[in-house]
Amino acid sequence: MRRAREAEMMKSQVLFPFLLSLFCGAISQQIRYTIPEELANGSRVGNLAKDLGLSVRELPTRKLRVSAEDYFNVSLESGDLLVNGRIDREKICGRKLECALEFETVTENPMNVFHVVVVIQDINDNAPRFVAKGIDLEICESALPGVKFSLDSAQDADVEGNSLKLYTINPNQYFSLSTKESPDGSKYPELLLEKPLDREHQSSHRLILTAMDGGDPPLSGTTHIWIRVTDANDNAPVFSQEVYRVSLQENVPWGTSVLRVMATDQDEGINAEITYAFLNSPISTSLFNLNPNTGDITTNGTLDFEETSRYVLSVEAKDGGVHTAHCNVQIEIVDENDNAPEVTFVSFSNQIPEDSDLGTVIALIKVRDKDSGQNGMVTCYIQEEVPFKLESTSKNYYKLVIAGALNREQTADYNVTIIATDKGKPALSSRTSITLHISDINDNAPVFHQASYVVHVSENNPPGASIAQVSASDPDLGPNGRVSYSILASDLEPRELLSYVSVSPQSGVVFAQRAFDHEQLRAFELTLQARDQGSPALSANVSLRVLVGDLNDNAPRVLYPALGPDGSALFDMVPRAAEPGYLVTKVVAVDADSGHNAWLSYHVLQASEPGLFSLGLRTGEVRTARALGDRDAARQRLLVAVRDGGQPPLSATATLHLIFADSLQEVLPDLSDRPEPSDPQTELQFYLVVALALISVLFLLAVILAIALRLRRSSSLDTEGCFQTGLCSKSGPGVPPNHSEGTLPYSYNLCVASHSAKTEFNFLNLTPEMAPPQDLLCDDPSMVVCASNEDHKIAYDPSLSSHQAPPNTDWRFSQAQRPGTSGSQNGDDTGTWPNNQFDTEMLQAMILASASEAADGSSTLGGGAGTMGLSARYGPQFTLQHVPDYRQNVYIPGSNATLTNAAGKRDGKAPAGGNGNKKKSGKKEKK
């Protein structure tokens, strides 16, 4: 009943398109889908309406339908082709390698017929299965070891990789199993006797036979082997031929006789009765029948040449005993013309270097048509416009070669469709698409995203911090496009470079290896290289400039006032008659920072007389705010704080000791008048010092008197000369001894410890090499002359002044060239903003120029108008090489002038020396 219904269905599938062809001119096109078997009902195969070029809105009017309604139907809402029934590949196609359902699709208004092919792919849904639940064997006990027994093979409805692969049995001492392959490729088990049997010892054996397929995961089936040991039968059946051969058309009807096999047995009785059976039962029983008594073989199904061109059947003849014989039957199937060409890639390389030459072979292609004659002659061509072409090498062989230039950066992949067409009527064709990947070569150098890089880094950065990142790109792939970074060059020393910066080879991040110091290094430049990993490698360079920003990490440092060589504080003398605004001294401080961080301000923290002195906010100049009163103490103390402009500000303090006196003699009693405990040794030292001072004063007075008389008689001198003794009086503000050597040839410092029971005088005498040929002190007749302790003879040669060389004009500066300082500003204490570009060498040059002017006699001690007015303490010994930017802080101790001498102008006084008032006080003391 079922067979009749299937036959009727197949008949309708044949008649339906035939009848439709009466109304349609021809099938317009063929649509092909591929699905796995056993899809659930309602599963989507594809959008049939879209593939037919129909819109969803047209479906109701076009009445789209298919002929294979048992398996598929069409959704009129979406146009999808849906599964309508169980699709079992094994049931539909059996053991055919390629299984497809072909049916027609019909549309109306207008009527069209389309041919649809749905390829059914096999899945591993069938486990190997033995037909019989058990296998019975009778083996004579006389069988010798090495005898083989062919067993019934298992059936596996799946094909190719999911089909049957091997057999196994449980371990035992008498038998082993091997898997054999028949000429048609099917596998069957063969039992091998390993050890002689003994019926009296064991009359039967039970084994478990397992068949496994090649699926993933593999499926298996088992059966039992019952072996009964019998008595000996000494003759086995013998076939008339070992191999039977026959040819058969592929479309013969069922039941067609193929041939008869025959075997004979010389035994008699039951041992001579022969029965025939197939060994490879899955193929045999599906397509062929074997009469067990006569040996006649007939067809039992449809033979297809394209599925199998040759069948090999294994036939077993068994007598009434235990002996068997085997033969093979080879059936050749005659072909008919019903196959399209097939394209096979014999050799194929889908990775093509982009620099490949024209004519390079990419693939070797073999075309095959299972048909013969004209229907089997095939031609191939490429459908797309691609830089490739096909060249015929021999019959049925083509090679795919490069026909144009390749550039991976423009096109990385090509899809090439090869169409093969036979010469049949009508012609059949097939197409195969391949994807060709263009492999990269290193033909592009890295490119930085910027032409150059500039980064700003604050000083005192943490070591190891990232300060910049450079980035370069390379359009190549893999190692050819993998960029690594390195430092190629720098304006730093090679040894210093490793301790300053490093760069990450992978990310291009530049790291600081140490904390930067703006005062030591303000900027540096690196040359970074980006290099790919190709062979040969390509690279690119870029410059990275690192600017180190300043932080307020240096507190101001007070240069003046400073402690004496023995640690004692220095004193500055102020005339008792000093008027308000008189320049007493100047606090000189420096700050190693720059910019706003080096802009210094001066503040009075503590004063013994708060209203007696004023302090310039930016200049550091200490001036008298009012005249000295009767109730004011002669000794004054100022505690000054110097702050910079940083955030937060840093500061330093300095203590000024000021004494109101008109001469040195007035200072000594005041200095020594302290309620200290009496010490005989100290008092003795004090008297010795006082005696020495008195002797020196008397000697100096005599020398000054002699020189004054001599100067009156000398009219050739432009200025009044000074004596060439080893000491001269300086009653102005004292400076540290290490700053006393300079352009002035005669100076001494009075250093008295303010908190000591001793009164000490420290004299700094000139060496003969430093003695100038002319007195550099200005024409002040009231100058107090001090006698030298080393030489009581005054050796003065007037001719020296006439041979004094004029100063080099290269060292002179015009008023515009001289740098402005805080003292050159107007009366407000706002100061000037420090210039960060101030050059230390220019300051040194100005100091030397001042020294040259002083030696020439054209400059006063305090500095006249248009001169620099630098004190001797800022001579070559104190060059301020450590001060990069302190113009506002340059002050000439003992003078009321700064670099531009504008302070004197602001006070409305002549630009005379800072010691002028003090010298007049000395003159009064002399009188």
Curated annotation (Swiss-Prot):
Disordered as annotated region, ranges: 797-836, 897-927
Membrane topology (UniProt): Single-pass type I membrane protein
Biased composition (Basic residues): 917-927
SMART domains: CA (SM00112)
InterPro entries reported for this sequence: Cadherin-like_dom, Cadherin-like_sf, Cadherin_C, Cadherin_CBD, Cadherin_CS, Cadherin_N, Protocadherin/Cadherin-CA
GO biological process: cell adhesion; homophilic cell adhesion via plasma membrane adhesion molecules; nervous system development
Transmembrane regions listed in the UniProt entry: 688-708
Glycan-modified residues: 41, 73, 300, 415, 541
Endpoints of the signal sequence: 1-28
Ribonucleoprotein as UniProt keyword: no
Membrane topology, Extracellular segments: 29-687
Subcellular location: Cell membrane
Main location: membrane
GO cellular component, one term: plasma membrane
Keywords: Calcium, Cell adhesion, Cell membrane, Glycoprotein, Membrane, Repeat, Signal, Transmembrane, Transmembrane helix
SUPFAM superfamilies for this protein: Cadherin-like (SSF49313)
Topological region Cytoplasmic: 709-927
Single GO molecular function: calcium ion binding
Function of the protein: Potential calcium-dependent cell-adhesion protein. May be involved in the establishment and maintenance of specific neuronal connections in the brain.
Protein name, UniProt field: Protocadherin gamma-B1
Native source species: Pan troglodytes
Organism lineage string: Eukaryota, Metazoa, Chordata, Craniata, Vertebrata
